[in-house]
């Protein structure tokens, strides 16, 4: 058993510190509004992009960040098409990007990510602009044929990918609190689960030794950055809100004709392979040459 004690309906108001300034717990209150102190050798802020813990320890400002060129709008649809029940798919049409994820209870999540410059149209008519963007991505529109939108359309704008300082004396930031990537590559849940587990494994054996604990959380943070940096950079390219480059077009054409390359691309999404292994310099040069040989090719588009 994990021997975890769960306190539902609790709200953390502040961090506690010992006489050396080390984080030593949290001040929280329940539904009765009474403030209580809970002390711990390690406080983990797994409290999202607007992390209270990050603010309290002075780590809110990222040391590496990239503003997304896309906004995000999504809704859930009743999905009668059983043939897609276990298939997630993503399409790009001009500057637009659309994704469909199968969910529980016969639902499919349909997400569109148009360039941020179109936000005004969504402000004026959220559902209308959402449906219009789906219609502008024919494969996504075909995927949703016969499906029915249930509930309201939701939005996420002002998206910024980042790395925050994520460890210090008695504290650590897990999940989106410490590192966030644009949802275009759908990596957030994977990374939150993986590095949350690795943080627990790193800290468990040294909770009674503050010096060793701080070393362990610092090493965990370094490993997370080494593991995630390349995917972060790849995500930022896809999040620019621009049409595919000629090299990207050639890459997907090649993948359509070469099952092994298609598998390699899927491995990038599943993190079994690094993006640089798929789009290596020799392959990029070959794809660029193919793009230049296309009728009407523009050399400036390859710069």
Predicted regions and their residues:
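Alpha-helix boundary recognition
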Residues: 1, 134-135, 145, 154, ...
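C-terminal helical "tail/cap" subdomain of flavin- and related membrane-associated enzymes
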Residues: 204-303
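Short acidic (Asp/Glu) and glycine-rich catalytic loops that position anionic groups and cofactors
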Residues: 110-112, 197, 230
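Predominantly flavin-linked oxidoreductase catalytic cores and closely associated redox partners
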Residues: 2-140
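Secondary-structure boundary/capping signal
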Residues: 6, 61, 141-142, 211, ...
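FAD/FMN-dependent oxidoreductases across multiple families
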Residues: 118-214
